[in-house]
């Protein structure tokens, strides 16, 4: 099995991979779902502060691989016979190292400017998103503290999502095809 990791700052367009994955019959597992599940399990409201604090606490208690370990265990239990599995939402270099030690891994980074991402998040209406600029900046700082900047800069592929949505989807699909073809 080969893992295709998707990384990018909140609102960059990481979830767009889901539609492409359906087209190519590739399973998508979201690392963010692991954190949101743990937040809910603790009886906390899903909002940027609680979800972010849960991610920090999980890493403090269980180490820097705290999200990657249960995510990969889940993939190995449920999807071990798949040729490809997409792991959406990789945040830290420790997660990359852990996943790369335990499976073949390529990373796609999706990049959008802060202004573009804020506009998207303000209109997305997901419980853990915010339409407040200061909360948005705090979330970005928390993500950067996880070392997501290192993951983005060391990614195998970079797709920019700043303009036309269909151009972005075409570029993302071409990148996905390169990875599939190379394997």
Swiss-Prot record:
GO molecular function ontology, one term from the record: ATP binding
Superkingdom as given in the UniProt entry: Archaea
Alphabetical keyword list: ATP-binding, Nucleotide-binding
Binding site for ATP: 8-15
One Pfam entry name: AAA_17
Bridged cysteine pairs (disulfide): none
Signal peptide segment: none
Family: Belongs to the UPF0200 family.
Protein name: UPF0200 protein MmarC5_0311
Biological source species: Methanococcus maripaludis (strain C5 / ATCC BAA-1333)
